[in-house]
C-alpha cells in the first residue's frame, strides 16, 4: 500500500495509475485490485489486437462496464499487417509487433498524461525464471523493454518498404522521459501472494469475465481444457493469432502453450507430473487449420508458403525417425 499512497500524493493528473488491459483474466484482476484494494484512480489503456475475437470484445466491454475510464489504442491496421507479415518471415513470430504496441501504449499514455504509476501484471522474470533477459526479478516494470521480444528493437521495421519512423510511434516508449518524471512501474504479482493464472481466472469470473466453454476441442487450441486448472478455457482469448503463434513456437523450440500450462499446474499442485506429460504429448503444438487459414488470408500468403516458412525455422530438437516422421527430442526428456 506504500506505493499506492506515494502515487496518490505525487500525481499531477486526474489519475493515480495507468494499467494496460485486454479484458482478460489478468488485466481484469489488476484493474479491480488497484481500484478496490489499493484505492487508486485508474486509467486503463486497451491495445486492440488485430482480428479481435467475439469473446475478446465481450471481455473488454465487460471491464469498461465495471466502472473505469478506458482508452483504446489501435495502431494503423495497414501498417500492422506489414509488420506482422515481416515478423512471420523474419522471425517466425507473428505476434512480435503486437507485443511492442501492447507494452508501449501504456507507457506512452502514462508519459503524455503525467501519471506517476504504471501497473503491470506478471513479471516473467519472477514467474518463469526469465530474469536473464535483463528484465530482472524485482518489482520494477520500467524494465519491460528488456523482455525477450522487445529487446530486438523496433527500428528493425524501418527496413520494410512503405514503413517510416512516424508509423511506429506507438511501438516504443521513452524510458528516459518516464524516469525524469520519477514515474514508478510495478509488476503486481511481486506484491500479491495469491497470484496464479487459475486464481486470476476465478477472481475475474466473479466480475463478469467470460472464458471458453469446457466443450472446446483441445486439439484446436493446442492445450487441455477439462483437466487441471482448465487453461484452455481462459488463456489467449482475445485474438486467434496467438494460437498460430503457439504452433510456430512448438516448431521452433519443441514446446508450445500446453507445456507452459502443464508447468503452471504442476506448480499449483493441480496436475501430477505423469498427468502433465500425457497431456503435453497429446495436445502440445496442435492448432485448428481454420486459425492457420485465417492467418494466411490475413497476410495474403498460401498455406503452402506458411508451412514452407515454418520448416525453415524448425529447431534442432526435431529429428526424423525410421518412418520419416518428425520426433521431438524435448519429449525424450519427459520421463
Where are these regions (language model features)?
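Short, glycine-rich nucleotide/cofactor-binding loops
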Residues: 17-26
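Nucleotide-activated chemistry modules centered on ATP-dependent adenylation/adenylyltransferase
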Residues: 1-16, 33-335
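Hydrophobic positions on the alpha1 helix immediately C-terminal to the Walker A/P-loop
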Residues: 29-30
Amino acid at each position: 500500500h506504500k506505493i499506492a499512497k506515494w502515487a496518490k500524493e505525487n500525481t499531477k493528473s486526474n489519475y493515480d495509475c495507468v494499467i494496460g488491459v485486454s479484458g482478460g483474466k489478468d488485466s481484469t484482476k489488476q484493474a479491480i485490485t488497484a481500484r478496490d484494494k489499493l484505492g487508486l484512480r485508474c486509467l486503463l489503456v486497451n491495445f486492440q489486437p488485430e482480428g479481435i475475437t467475439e469473446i475478446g470484445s465481450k471481455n473488454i466491454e465487460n471491464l469498461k462496464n465495471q466502472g473505469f475510464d478506458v482508452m483504446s489504442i489501435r495502431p494503423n491496421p495497414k501498417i500492422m499487417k506489414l509488420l506482422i507479415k515481416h515478423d512471420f518471415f523474419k522471425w517466425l513470430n507473428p505476434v512480435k509487433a503486437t507485443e511492442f504496441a501492447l507494452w508501449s501504449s501504456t507507457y506512452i499514455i502514462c508519459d503524455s498524461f503525467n501519471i506517476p504509476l504504471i501497473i503491470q501484471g506478471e513479471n516473467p522474470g519472477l514467474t518463469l525464471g526469465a530474469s536473464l533477459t535483463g528484465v530482472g526479478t524485482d518489482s520494477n516494470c520500467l524494465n519491460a523493454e528488456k523482455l525477450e521480444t522487445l529487446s530486438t528493437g523496433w527500428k528493425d521495421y524501418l527496413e520494410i518498404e512503405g514503413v517510416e519512423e512516424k508509423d511506429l510511434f506507438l511501438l516504443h516508449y521513452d524510458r528516459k522521459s518516464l524516469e525524469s518524471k520519477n514515474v514508478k512501474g510495478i509488476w503486481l504479482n511481486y506484491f500479491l501472494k495469491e497470484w496464479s493464472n487459475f486464481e486470476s481466472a476465478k477472481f475475474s469470473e466473479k466480475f463478469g469475465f467470460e472464458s471458453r466453454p469446457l466443450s472446446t476441442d483441445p486439439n484446436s487450441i493446442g492445450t487441455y481444457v477439462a483437466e487441471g486448472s482448465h487453461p484452455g478455457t481462459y488463456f489467449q482469448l482475445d485474438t486467434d493469432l496467438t494460437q498460430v503463434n503457439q504452433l510456430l513456437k512448438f516448431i521452433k523450440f519443441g514446446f508450445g502453450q500446453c507445456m507452459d500450462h502443464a508447468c503452471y499446474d504442476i506448480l499449483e499442485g493441480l496436475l501430477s507430473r505423469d498427468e502433465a506429460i500425457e497431456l503435453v504429448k497429446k495436445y502440445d503444438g496442435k492448432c485448428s487449420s481454420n486459425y492457420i487459414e485465417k492467418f494466411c488470408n490475413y497476410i495474403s500468403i498460401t498455406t503452402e508458403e506458411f508451412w514452407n516458412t515454418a520448416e525453415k525455422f524448425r529447431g534442432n530438437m526435431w529429428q526424423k525417425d525410421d518412418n520419416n516422421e518428425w520426433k521431438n527430442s524435448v519429449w525424450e526428456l519427459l520421463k
